[in-house]
Curated annotation (Swiss-Prot):
Residues 185-371 form the Glutamine amidotransferase type-1 domain. InterPro entries: Anth_synth/Amidotransfase (IPR050472), CarbamoylP_synth_ssu (IPR006274), CarbamoylP_synth_ssu_N (IPR002474), CarbP_synth_ssu_N_sf (IPR036480), Class_I_gatase-like (IPR029062), CPSase_GATase1 (IPR035686), GATASE (IPR017926). Small subunit of the glutamine-dependent carbamoyl phosphate synthetase (CPSase). CPSase catalyzes the formation of carbamoyl phosphate from the ammonia moiety of glutamine, carbonate, and phosphate donated by ATP, constituting the first step of 2 biosynthetic pathways, one leading to arginine and/or urea and the other to pyrimidine nucleotides. The small subunit (glutamine amidotransferase) binds and cleaves glutamine to supply the large subunit with the substrate ammonia. One of its GO terms (biological process) is 'de novo' pyrimidine nucleobase biosynthetic process. Its EC number is 6.3.5.5. This is Carbamoyl phosphate synthase small chain. GO terms for molecular function: ATP binding; carbamoyl-phosphate synthase (glutamine-hydrolyzing) activity; glutaminase activity. It is an enzyme of class 6 (ligase). L-glutamine binds at residues 52, 233, 235, 262, 265, 303, 305-306.
Length: 371
């Protein structure tokens, strides 16, 4: 619905030379990023603020976006309950139709939100065509432009997503403490954690200490943690050699440890497993996983472009905990020597189903000694 201004030109330029014209909204400008898509029907405030989307241009396949607007931020003990970080992390947004909001708690439109945060958007794009191209050719770099023409796109596209370290922008510069109801401290090695994960830890009474991702094992142990969580985050995990080294050092303390998404990948590489780039990744809120310990199937939220592609790539002394029946990717493992569990998917969802929030209950039992 053209409810604010339909005169702003918008462009999406793909690395393979494809140029698509639409209508710009949000902030005017040009952004460059890896073109990725999500099939989620809702949850655009959470998706856009997910730090894992740093460096990426998000294409949403659902045709109607914006119809419930953008709510006011809500905090519990410094933790956002309706956004995944303090700001939009994606480089830009590509959608089919921008709709006028109609919901009681909407404080601004999607256009106003993107405008206030300096993020360009383009609508009126055949998102199905974009997705078909990405699915057949794989993820690629792209340019999004709102109200500005793109000259010399080849110059912009010299940047390569796989070669850039994005966690320097999403990891905190100093420790952040969220006081819980108990004295049980969980240190989060924060590569760009979603607030949904923080909230699940808070609900279980933990005092959460978020530390920069480059913190050494000695600095982490200064907080006397009873458990560790290695968080999600953006970018190519194979570039994060220092973080892998730190993980190898900290696991010698044998603390109960949970790795989620990027944290799962870091743990995998630290213990000798292999993490590889996927053709177009998993980004959706309806991905199935099978729990090998029970045989049960769960519907889960995914946002990752790298993965353990087969059971042969898991670390030694681990057993596969979850796998995706669609393509066989390993979605979690349990270590047989160290007190470590991991999930590639997001057990906190946000957005998505709450089928596997019990993973945090399992982690709590590990921390308090009942596992």
């Amino acid at each position: 619905m053209d409810y604010y201004n339909n005169d702003t030109p918008g462009y999406v330029y793909l690395e393979d030379g494809t140029l698509m014209k639409g209508i710009g909204f949000g902030a005017k400008g040009i952004r460059v990023g890896e073109i990725v898509f999500t099939t989620s029907m809702n949850g655009y405030p959470e998706s856009l603020t997910d730090p894992s989307y740093k460096g990426q241009i998000l294409v949403i396949t659902h045709p109607l976006i914006g119809n419930y607007g953008v709510p006011e931020k809500n905090y519990v003990n410094g933790i956002l309950t309706n956004f995944e970080s303090e700001r939009i992390q994606a480089e830009g947004l590509v959608i089919s139709e921008l709709t006028e909001p109609f919901k009681w708690n909407s404080k601004q439109t999607l256009h106003e939100w993107l405008l206030s945060e300096g993020i360009p958007g383009v609508y009126g794009i055949d998102t199905r065509a974009v997705v078909k191209r990405v699915r057949s050719r794989g993820v690629m770099m792209g340019i999004i432009a709102s109200g500005v023409e793109v000259n010399n796109p080849e110059e912009y596209l010299k940047k390569k997503y796989d070669e850039m370290n994005f966690i320097q922008y999403t990891s905190p510069k100093a420790p952040i403490i969220h006081q819980g109801k108990t004295g049980d401290v969980v240190v989060v090695v924060d590569c760009g954690i979603k607030h949904g994960i923080l909230y699940q830890l808070y609900l279980r009474g933990f005092t959460v200490v978020r530390v920069p991702c480059n913190y050494s094992a000695d600095k982490i142990m200064d907080f006397y943690p009873k458990g560790l969580l290695f968080s999600n985050g953006p970018g190519n995990p194979n570039l994060l050699t220092d973080l892998v080294k730190n993980f190898r050092e900290i696991i010698e303390y044998n603390l109960p440890t949970l790795g989620i998404c990027l944290g799962h990948q870091i743990a995998t590489m630290a213990l000798g497993g292999k993490v590889k780039k996927m053709k177009f990744g998993h980004r959706a809120i309806n991905k199935p996983v099978i729990d090998t310990t029970t045989g049960k199937s769960y519907i889960t939220t995914h946002n990752h472009g790298y993965a353990i592609l087969s059971k042969q790539d898991v670390p030694i002394h681990t057993r596969v905990w979850f796998y995706n029946p669609d393509d066989g990717t390993v979605e979690g493992w349990i270590h047989e020597k160290y007190n470590i569990i991991t999930t590639q998917f997001h057990p906190e969802a946000r957005p998505g189903p709450w089928d596997v929030t019990w993973v945090f209950d399992k982690f709590k039992k590990m921390v308090v000694g009942d596992a």
